[in-house]
Amino acid sequence: TRILFNGLRALGVETLSPQGRLFVMARREVVLSAGAIHTPQILSLSGVGPAIDLQRLGIGVRVDSPDVGKHLQDHVQLRCVYRAQNVNTLNQLFHSKPEKALAIFRYALNRSGWLAQGALRAVAFADSQESHSRPDLQLFFSPFSTDQLGGPPHKFPGMSISVIPLRPKSRGQLTLSSADIDTPPRIYLPYLENAEDMSLALKGIDLARRIASQSALR
Protein backbone atom coordinates (compact mmCIF):
# COMPACT_ATOMS: atom_id res chain seq x y z
CA THR A 1 0.00 0.00 0.00
CA ARG A 2 2.95 2.35 0.54
CA ILE A 3 6.70 2.56 0.99
CA LEU A 4 8.09 3.08 4.48
CA PHE A 5 10.67 5.85 4.74
CA ASN A 6 13.15 7.22 7.22
CA GLY A 7 13.73 10.66 5.81
CA LEU A 8 14.42 10.04 2.14
CA ARG A 9 15.61 6.48 2.64
CA ALA A 10 13.22 3.62 1.85
CA LEU A 11 13.22 1.04 4.65
CA GLY A 12 10.43 -1.34 3.63
CA VAL A 13 6.81 -1.56 2.55
CA GLU A 14 3.38 -1.69 4.09
CA THR A 15 1.04 -4.35 2.69
CA LEU A 16 -2.49 -5.56 3.36
CA SER A 17 -3.15 -9.12 4.49
CA PRO A 18 -6.22 -10.98 5.80
CA GLN A 19 -4.88 -10.27 9.29
CA GLY A 20 -4.59 -6.53 8.61
CA ARG A 21 -1.67 -4.29 7.79
CA LEU A 22 1.70 -5.96 7.54
CA PHE A 23 5.05 -4.16 7.61
CA VAL A 24 7.93 -5.77 5.72
CA MET A 25 11.39 -4.30 6.29
CA ALA A 26 14.14 -4.57 3.68
CA ARG A 27 17.61 -5.88 4.44
CA ARG A 28 19.24 -4.14 1.49
CA GLU A 29 16.93 -2.19 -0.78
CA VAL A 30 13.31 -1.66 -1.77
CA VAL A 31 12.48 -2.32 -5.42
CA LEU A 32 9.07 -1.01 -6.50
CA SER A 33 7.82 -2.92 -9.54
CA ALA A 34 4.04 -2.80 -9.52
CA GLY A 35 3.32 -2.07 -13.17
CA ALA A 36 2.49 1.08 -15.09
CA ILE A 37 -0.63 1.80 -13.02
CA HIS A 38 0.14 0.71 -9.47
CA THR A 39 3.76 1.90 -9.36
CA PRO A 40 2.89 5.63 -9.57
CA GLN A 41 -0.15 5.01 -7.35
CA ILE A 42 1.99 3.50 -4.58
CA LEU A 43 4.65 6.20 -4.98
CA SER A 44 2.01 8.90 -4.64
CA LEU A 45 0.41 7.25 -1.60
CA SER A 46 3.91 7.14 -0.10
CA GLY A 47 4.30 10.90 -0.50
CA VAL A 48 6.38 10.86 -3.67
CA GLY A 49 4.61 12.70 -6.47
CA PRO A 50 3.19 16.08 -7.53
CA ALA A 51 2.94 18.07 -4.30
CA ILE A 52 -0.26 19.89 -5.29
CA ASP A 53 -2.08 16.60 -5.94
CA LEU A 54 -0.86 14.98 -2.72
CA GLN A 55 -1.79 17.97 -0.57
CA ARG A 56 -5.28 18.03 -2.06
CA LEU A 57 -5.84 14.52 -0.67
CA GLY A 58 -4.16 15.18 2.67
CA ILE A 59 -1.08 13.07 1.88
CA GLY A 60 2.16 14.31 3.40
CA VAL A 61 4.68 15.32 0.76
CA ARG A 62 7.99 13.52 1.12
CA VAL A 63 9.35 14.33 -2.33
CA ASP A 64 7.74 16.79 -4.75
CA SER A 65 8.17 14.86 -8.01
CA PRO A 66 5.83 16.33 -10.66
CA ASP A 67 6.54 13.62 -13.24
CA VAL A 68 5.17 10.74 -11.15
CA GLY A 69 2.11 9.48 -13.03
CA LYS A 70 2.92 11.49 -16.15
CA HIS A 71 4.00 10.35 -19.64
CA LEU A 72 1.66 7.33 -19.54
CA GLN A 73 1.52 5.50 -22.84
CA ASP A 74 -0.17 2.39 -24.20
CA HIS A 75 -0.77 0.59 -27.48
CA VAL A 76 -4.21 0.84 -29.05
CA GLN A 77 -5.67 -2.14 -30.91
CA LEU A 78 -7.95 -1.49 -33.87
CA ARG A 79 -9.88 -4.46 -35.25
CA CYS A 80 -11.22 -4.96 -38.74
CA VAL A 81 -13.98 -7.60 -38.69
CA TYR A 82 -15.05 -9.55 -41.77
CA ARG A 83 -17.75 -12.08 -42.62
CA ALA A 84 -16.30 -15.29 -44.02
CA GLN A 85 -17.87 -17.24 -46.87
CA ASN A 86 -17.88 -20.97 -47.59
CA VAL A 87 -15.77 -21.78 -44.55
CA ASN A 88 -16.34 -22.47 -40.87
CA THR A 89 -14.53 -20.33 -38.33
CA LEU A 90 -14.24 -20.49 -34.57
CA ASN A 91 -17.52 -18.57 -34.44
CA GLN A 92 -19.44 -21.66 -35.54
CA LEU A 93 -17.47 -23.96 -33.26
CA PHE A 94 -18.22 -21.73 -30.28
CA HIS A 95 -21.97 -21.75 -30.91
CA SER A 96 -22.23 -25.50 -31.63
CA LYS A 97 -22.69 -27.73 -28.57
CA PRO A 98 -21.64 -30.91 -30.44
CA GLU A 99 -18.51 -29.19 -31.75
CA LYS A 100 -17.63 -27.90 -28.29
CA ALA A 101 -18.13 -31.35 -26.77
CA LEU A 102 -15.91 -32.88 -29.47
CA ALA A 103 -13.27 -30.22 -28.89
CA ILE A 104 -13.22 -30.93 -25.15
CA PHE A 105 -12.92 -34.66 -25.83
CA ARG A 106 -10.05 -34.22 -28.31
CA TYR A 107 -8.19 -31.91 -25.98
CA ALA A 108 -8.63 -34.24 -22.99
CA LEU A 109 -7.59 -37.25 -25.08
CA ASN A 110 -4.41 -36.00 -26.73
CA ARG A 111 -4.26 -32.21 -26.34
CA SER A 112 -5.33 -31.62 -29.94
CA GLY A 113 -8.11 -29.71 -31.69
CA TRP A 114 -9.01 -26.05 -31.63
CA LEU A 115 -8.84 -25.84 -27.83
CA ALA A 116 -5.12 -26.58 -28.13
CA GLN A 117 -4.63 -23.65 -30.51
CA GLY A 118 -4.09 -20.00 -29.79
CA ALA A 119 -6.52 -17.26 -30.69
CA LEU A 120 -3.97 -15.59 -32.97
CA ARG A 121 -3.06 -17.69 -36.00
CA ALA A 122 -0.70 -15.28 -37.72
CA VAL A 123 1.28 -12.17 -36.79
CA ALA A 124 2.87 -9.68 -39.17
CA PHE A 125 5.12 -6.68 -38.70
CA ALA A 126 4.95 -4.01 -41.40
CA ASP A 127 6.75 -0.81 -42.33
CA SER A 128 4.15 1.76 -43.38
CA GLN A 129 6.84 3.98 -44.89
CA GLU A 130 8.42 1.10 -46.85
CA SER A 131 11.76 2.49 -45.72
CA HIS A 132 13.10 -0.96 -44.82
CA SER A 133 14.35 0.44 -41.52
CA ARG A 134 12.09 -1.05 -38.87
CA PRO A 135 8.39 -1.95 -38.59
CA ASP A 136 5.92 0.56 -37.19
CA LEU A 137 2.81 -1.64 -37.41
CA GLN A 138 1.86 -5.02 -35.96
CA LEU A 139 -1.06 -7.06 -37.30
CA PHE A 140 -2.81 -10.09 -35.79
CA PHE A 141 -5.01 -12.50 -37.73
CA SER A 142 -7.76 -14.32 -35.80
CA PRO A 143 -10.21 -16.91 -37.22
CA PHE A 144 -13.13 -15.48 -35.22
CA SER A 145 -14.92 -12.18 -34.74
CA THR A 146 -16.66 -10.37 -31.88
CA ASP A 147 -18.27 -7.01 -31.23
CA GLN A 148 -15.81 -6.35 -28.42
CA LEU A 149 -12.83 -8.06 -26.85
CA GLY A 150 -13.96 -10.64 -24.32
CA GLY A 151 -17.44 -10.84 -25.79
CA PRO A 152 -19.02 -13.89 -27.47
CA PRO A 153 -18.17 -14.56 -31.13
CA HIS A 154 -20.66 -13.57 -33.80
CA LYS A 155 -23.09 -16.23 -34.94
CA PHE A 156 -21.99 -15.81 -38.55
CA PRO A 157 -18.62 -17.07 -39.86
CA GLY A 158 -16.09 -14.34 -39.27
CA MET A 159 -12.46 -13.36 -38.96
CA SER A 160 -10.55 -10.39 -37.60
CA ILE A 161 -7.40 -8.50 -38.48
CA SER A 162 -6.15 -6.39 -35.60
CA VAL A 163 -3.92 -3.38 -36.19
CA ILE A 164 -1.54 -2.10 -33.50
CA PRO A 165 0.52 1.04 -34.24
CA LEU A 166 3.95 0.65 -32.63
CA ARG A 167 5.86 3.24 -30.57
CA PRO A 168 2.89 5.59 -29.94
CA LYS A 169 3.62 9.24 -29.25
CA SER A 170 0.36 10.11 -27.48
CA ARG A 171 0.89 10.56 -23.73
CA GLY A 172 -1.52 10.42 -20.83
CA GLN A 173 -1.34 10.58 -17.08
CA LEU A 174 -2.47 8.95 -13.85
CA THR A 175 -3.55 10.80 -10.71
CA LEU A 176 -4.87 9.67 -7.35
CA SER A 177 -8.60 9.93 -6.78
CA SER A 178 -8.31 9.04 -3.09
CA ALA A 179 -5.76 8.39 -0.36
CA ASP A 180 -7.22 4.86 -0.12
CA ILE A 181 -5.22 2.17 -1.94
CA ASP A 182 -8.46 0.32 -2.78
CA THR A 183 -9.82 3.29 -4.74
CA PRO A 184 -8.76 3.11 -8.40
CA PRO A 185 -6.73 6.08 -9.62
CA ARG A 186 -7.89 8.36 -12.42
CA ILE A 187 -6.36 7.25 -15.70
CA TYR A 188 -6.30 9.50 -18.74
CA LEU A 189 -5.06 7.84 -21.93
CA PRO A 190 -5.59 9.97 -25.06
CA TYR A 191 -5.27 7.22 -27.64
CA LEU A 192 -4.44 8.57 -31.12
CA GLU A 193 -4.37 12.18 -29.87
CA ASN A 194 -1.04 12.66 -31.59
CA ALA A 195 -1.49 13.33 -35.32
CA GLU A 196 1.30 10.91 -36.25
CA ASP A 197 -0.37 8.14 -34.23
CA MET A 198 -3.66 8.76 -36.05
CA SER A 199 -1.97 8.77 -39.45
CA LEU A 200 -0.18 5.51 -38.69
CA ALA A 201 -3.39 3.88 -37.46
CA LEU A 202 -5.18 4.80 -40.69
CA LYS A 203 -2.32 3.33 -42.72
CA GLY A 204 -2.59 0.14 -40.69
CA ILE A 205 -6.32 -0.15 -41.31
CA ASP A 206 -5.75 0.41 -45.03
CA LEU A 207 -3.15 -2.38 -45.02
CA ALA A 208 -5.53 -4.74 -43.18
CA ARG A 209 -8.24 -4.04 -45.74
CA ARG A 210 -5.86 -4.71 -48.62
CA ILE A 211 -4.85 -8.03 -47.05
CA ALA A 212 -8.49 -9.03 -46.49
CA SER A 213 -9.35 -8.21 -50.10
CA GLN A 214 -6.88 -10.76 -51.49
CA SER A 215 -8.46 -13.58 -53.49
CA ALA A 216 -7.28 -16.25 -51.03
CA LEU A 217 -9.41 -14.68 -48.30
CA ARG A 218 -12.54 -14.00 -50.31
Residues of each region from the PLM?
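Mid-to-C-terminal "cap/lid" subdomains and adjacent gly/pro-rich loops that border
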Residues: 50-155, 210, 215-217
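Core beta-strand elements of the Rossmann-like FAD/NAD(P) dinucleotide-binding domain
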Residues: 19-29, 33-34
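Short acidic/polar mixed-charge low-complexity motifs
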Residues: 9, 20-22, 133, 170, ...
